[in-house]
Amino acid sequence: MARIAGINIPPHKHAEIGLTAIFGIGRNRARKICDASGIAYSKKIKDLTDGDLEKIRVQIEQFTIEGDLRRETTMNIKRLMDIGCYRGFRHRRGLPVRGQRTRTNARTRKGPRKGAAALKK
């Protein structure tokens, strides 16, 4: 099993798909990494040589991924909440941030419905 950036990449998947197991790498970025490394998208992870894996590691080091990316995202949201802007307020209240309606829908962000009894209290 190949290990890249502290993540075990599924060996039976194609290189393009397997790289998406790393947080911060989607299909588009995985294709760019494969192109820069000279690896075919359809090549299975288990068929990659150590040299190929090292080329991929070198390419991935150019991007912010995994823990660093999660930390950066969290810090950006925290900064918005600290400066007291509208977006920070919406994050703090657990409501949609990008202008979506909340009278109906928005259940993903607001959580499960509160019954009529809970609203009367």
UniProtKB/Swiss-Prot annotation:
Gene3D superfamilies: 1.10.8.50, 30s ribosomal protein s13, domain 2
Tagged with keyword rRNA-binding: yes
Lineage top rank: taxon: Bacteria
Entries under Pfam families matching the protein: Ribosomal_S13
Molecular functions per Gene Ontology: rRNA binding; structural constituent of ribosome; tRNA binding
Entry keyword annotation includes NAD: no
A GO CC annotation given for this chain: cytosol
One record GO biological process: translation
InterPro entries with a match to the protein in the record: Rbsml_uS13_C, Ribosomal_uS13, Ribosomal_uS13-like_H2TH, Ribosomal_uS13_bac-type, Ribosomal_uS13_CS
Stretches the record annotates as Disordered: 94-121
Keywords recorded for this protein, A-Z: Ribonucleoprotein, Ribosomal protein, RNA-binding, rRNA-binding, tRNA-binding
Role this protein plays: Located at the top of the head of the 30S subunit, it contacts several helices of the 16S rRNA. In the 70S ribosome it contacts the 23S rRNA (bridge B1a) and protein L5 of the 50S subunit (bridge B1b), connecting the 2 subunits; these bridges are implicated in subunit movement. Contacts the tRNAs in the A and P-sites.
Family classification: Belongs to the universal ribosomal protein uS13 family.
Complexes and interactors: Part of the 30S ribosomal subunit. Forms a loose heterodimer with protein S19. Forms two bridges to the 50S subunit in the 70S ribosome.
NCBIfam families linked to this entry: uS13_bact
Name of the featured protein: Small ribosomal subunit protein uS13
Naturally occurring in which organism (per UniProt): Verminephrobacter eiseniae (strain EF01-2)
High-level lineage: Bacteria, Pseudomonadati, Pseudomonadota, Betaproteobacteria, Burkholderiales
Gene: rpsM
